[in-house]
Amino acid sequence: MPAGLAALIARAGKSRSAPPVERWNPPFCGDIDMRIAADGRWYYLGSPIGREALVRLFASVLRREEDGRFLLVTPVEKLGITVEDAPFLGVELHAEQEEAGADTGQVLTLRTNVGDVVRIGAEHPLRFEQEVGTDGLKPYVLVRGRLEALFSRPLLYQLVELFEERDVDGIRMLGVMSDGMFFPAMAVDFFPAMAVDAASEGEA
């Protein structure tokens, strides 16, 4: 294992503060055989990393560059890794209504597989992509820096149940509200059956 990562592991547990990886600018020392699979699992040298604490440690020093590369960053080295989709996976979603008098209304909070908890809104926006080959929806939330979390399949279904209709630039859209913001997912006409289901649930 590269020296910088080995030193990081040795120091693990001595500090609970998040490493300032956005401020570190060590030399790039090449790519290593580490991969984050589309299901959120981490692999090193082809084998899954079974220790959750180790995965969270590596996740804490993960950074995405402007060119899209994913790097593990320590004070002494930058190492490239492979990410098949998003680096993190959303595993738990809570929807709550703010207290009476608040302007935000519904607030969605997401927990990731590496322990991050984010409140979906202006600082942690939600976006949707169409899944290649199936036209299914893939929701992503910005967690930190340029790093996103992809919703797990069960959470996608939970999110769809919260869909409502809004006009966006003259187009009727399905999407979800959180922290005073509307995040559009698709045009109502694109998935009429889903629109009917969402409208029926909203009237119930």
Question: Which residues fall in each region the model found?
Answer:
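Long, non-globular segments of proteins
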Residues: 1-204
